[in-house]
């Protein structure tokens, strides 16, 4: 990383990833180089937030966003709600942002939430959960659960749990904790989540040094949010370590091929299906962790984001028993054996 522009060491990924994606990767590493981990947390967050602003394309037309607070036992939790003018929402998405449990907030993923709302017509509520290291587990989970419970108590709409990376972990943990709730989630959509999977898994080995997320990064983020004596088998910390995968809502997991966490999505799909549930896993070829921010400039990331939007729009319909209600993507996924998504093969070297 010694050059002025922090050019990423490309190694085996040099030809595996599209040139447009490399432009994105290098841009992220210019903003947020690995050595930034040596700075105080407040400075890391300031740089991360500035990077997120630089990638923000603005809100789609016809969208309104408003901030509020959800009263919880520990504190009032900031939230931001999104609605599309002239559209009666058919569901509400509770969104948990990424950032390794250390970074991010309502602004960092504002554009993604806005675009989910605009594309689906659903209400979206983004949760500003507490961050590590100031607040160790289960603080983030407690906030995530409190926001779900508030939505369940105040909205009659079907609830979709959604999150990316660390937020995908929280969404899944909430789904497990609330599966017997009278207003349990109608579906969950997890975007390259870290679920506490077996690090002997395929992607952990093959992509241990992938661009933008390495095995070392995963270990750092796990340790920084762990309270003393934290059990890795706690399902509110590592949903894949749960002993019971029954009763979970219809689930879509979308992962990136070149991401050590991808095997978590595959394993999670398999556990839910084995327990009699409905789950689909889709590994997006030639993409890396955090590809959502590349959706405007990298065609492959844009295609993957459309898959995500289709999954969010469709997941609440899976219990309706009407195939006409299911989007083409969901129909294609649901037609695969073992209730799984088509596991795409890379279409390039």
Task: Describe the residue ranges of each PLM region.
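A charge-rich, low-complexity, intrinsically flexible signal that marks solvent-exposed coils, linkers
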Residues: 339-348
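Alpha/beta hydrolase fold serine-hydrolase catalytic domain that processes acyl esters and thioesters
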Residues: 172-320
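Glycine-biased, low-complexity coil/linker segments
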Residues: 331-332
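Short beta-strand element of the alpha/beta-hydrolase
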Residues: 90-99
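Catalytic nucleophile-loop/oxyanion-hole region of alpha/beta-hydrolase
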Residues: 105-106, 112, 125-158, 295-301
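A fold-wide structural signal in alpha/beta-hydrolase
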Residues: 92, 121-125
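A glycine/proline-hinged amphipathic helix-loop "lid/cap" segment
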Residues: 1-84
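Gly/Ala-rich beta-loop-alpha elbow adjacent to hydrolase catalytic centers
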Residues: 163, 167, 171
């Amino acid at each position: 990383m010694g050059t002025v522009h922090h050019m990423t060491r490309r190694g085996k990924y040099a030809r595996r990833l599209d040139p447009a994606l490399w432009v994105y990767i290098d841009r992220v590493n210019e903003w947020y180089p690995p050595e930034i981990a040596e700075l105080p947390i407040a400075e890391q967050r300031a740089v991360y937030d500035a990077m997120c602003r630089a990638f923000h394309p603005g809100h789609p037309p016809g969208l309104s966003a408003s901030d509020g607070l959800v009263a919880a036992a520990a504190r009032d939790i900031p939230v931001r709600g999104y609605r599309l003018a002239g559209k009666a929402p058919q569901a509400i998405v509770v969104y948990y942002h990424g950032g390794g449990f250390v970074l991010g907030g309502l602004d960092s993923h504002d554009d993604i939430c806005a675009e989910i709302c605009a594309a689906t017509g659903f209400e979206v509520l983004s949760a500003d959960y507490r961050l590590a290291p100031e607040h160790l587990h289960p603080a983030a989970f407690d906030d995530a659960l409190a926001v779900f419970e508030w939505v369940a108590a105040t909205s009659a709409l079907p609830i979709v749990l959604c999150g990316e990376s660390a937020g995908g972990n929280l969404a899944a943990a909430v789904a497990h904790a609330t599966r017997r709730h009278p207003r349990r989630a109608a579906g969950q959509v997890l975007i390259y989540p870290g679920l506490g999977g077996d690090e002997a898994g395929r992607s952990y080995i093959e992509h241990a040094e992938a661009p933008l997320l390495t095995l070392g990064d995963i270990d750092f983020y796990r340790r920084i949010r762990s309270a003393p004596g934290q059990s890795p088998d706690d399902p509110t910390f590592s949903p894949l370590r749960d002993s019971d995968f029954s009763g979970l809502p219809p689930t879509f997991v979308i992962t990136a091929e070149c991401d050590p966490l991808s095997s978590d999505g595959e394993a999670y799909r398999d556990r839910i299906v084995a327990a009699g549930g409905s789950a689909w896993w889709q590994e997006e070829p030639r993409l890396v962790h955090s590809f959502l921010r590349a959706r405007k400039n990298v065609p492959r990331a844009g295609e993957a984001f459309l898959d995500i939007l289709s999954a969010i729009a469709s997941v609440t319909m899976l219990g309706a028993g009407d195939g006409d209600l299911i989007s083409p993507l969901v129909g294609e996924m649901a037609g695969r054996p073992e209730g799984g998504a088509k596991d795409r093969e890379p279409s390039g070297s």
